[in-house]
Amino acid sequence: MQVSDFHFELPDELIARYPQPERTASRLLQLNGNSGELNDGQFTDILDLVQAGDLLVFNNTRVIPARMFGMKASGGKLEVLVERVLDEHSVLAHVRCSKSPKPGTMLLLGENQEHEAEMVARHDTLFEIRFTSDKKVLDILDEIGHMPLPPYIDRPDEDADKERYQTVYNKKPGAVAAPTAGLHFDTEILEKMKAKGVEFAYVTLHVGAGTFQPVRVDNILEHHMHSEYAEVSQEVIDAINATKARGGRVVSVGTTSVRSLESAAQHALKQGTELAPFFDDTEIFIYPGYEFQVVDALVTNFHLPESTLIMLVSAFAGYENTMKAYEQAVNNKYRFFSYGDAMFITKKTA
């Protein structure tokens, strides 16, 4: 398939630049993967769509304030976007400035250039940066970093984004983009689901800035995915096995949860073993033709045209079903992308 097969026209006004006043106030487009049937509704309808015995799998990564501003010690402004925390004092980052810094270049980061760091090495398009102080990287980021809003939101981050560009169940810091399907859940709706007999499990996938990189080839088979770190614990494996045994569904909240679960499944298939814990980097690329091993239903936002995420949705719901759903979403003026509305999709099995 060609990347252009996943194109759709999106009016600029449908890109959500701010979240709704309440997390659960978004709309929800339901898509039945087998029949192609579409239903417009509200996000709170999800309480009727999940059933006792289902397992919801969330990504509990925490978005770090990964964007820093500063200058080279020799002069010249720069912007640093952390891609990955390497250890307590070092990061891998994208650096934007007029001239790329060479190894050994000293950087002064923060509004008042209060934190000194050294550009240690370059790895392709990323720079390894080491802070010289005894403070831990995550503490420095909390002090001087800005929330790394996606480029299409097209505005500076605000104080409210520290809360709203973060799930209510976030736990493990490391992401530089939110697992956005989870943004629709507040504590009240989670409690209602639990009361209904729905079970929860948590994976971790630290979403990288690569998630916003465009696909730069024409044929999707030539695309190479960026790498992200994922964790699927034994506790999650046990919950999945118990759910399948009782006839429940594994409902993935977000594409990052899908990629975590299916990475574990693919690893097990290659090893010739049962589903097992997975703690590793993943470059899994899911596109039409992929056979899902774990996930039965999916909660997800509306994704960018020609992105790997709309390809994943097409693999799950069927290509034609997905493109029709997106056409309906545009016609019915759903809000798109990170702060936008959501879909609830059941897997195409036939």
UniProtKB/Swiss-Prot annotation:
One of its GO terms (molecular function) is S-adenosylmethionine:tRNA ribosyltransferase-isomerase activity. The keyword Phosphoprotein does not apply. It is an enzyme of class 2 (transferase). PANTHER family: S-ADENOSYLMETHIONINE:TRNA RIBOSYLTRANSFERASE-ISOMERASE. GO terms for cellular component: cytoplasm. Keywords: Cytoplasm, Queuosine biosynthesis, S-adenosyl-L-methionine, Transferase. This is S-adenosylmethionine:tRNA ribosyltransferase-isomerase. Pfam families: Queuosine_synth. Coiled coil: none annotated.
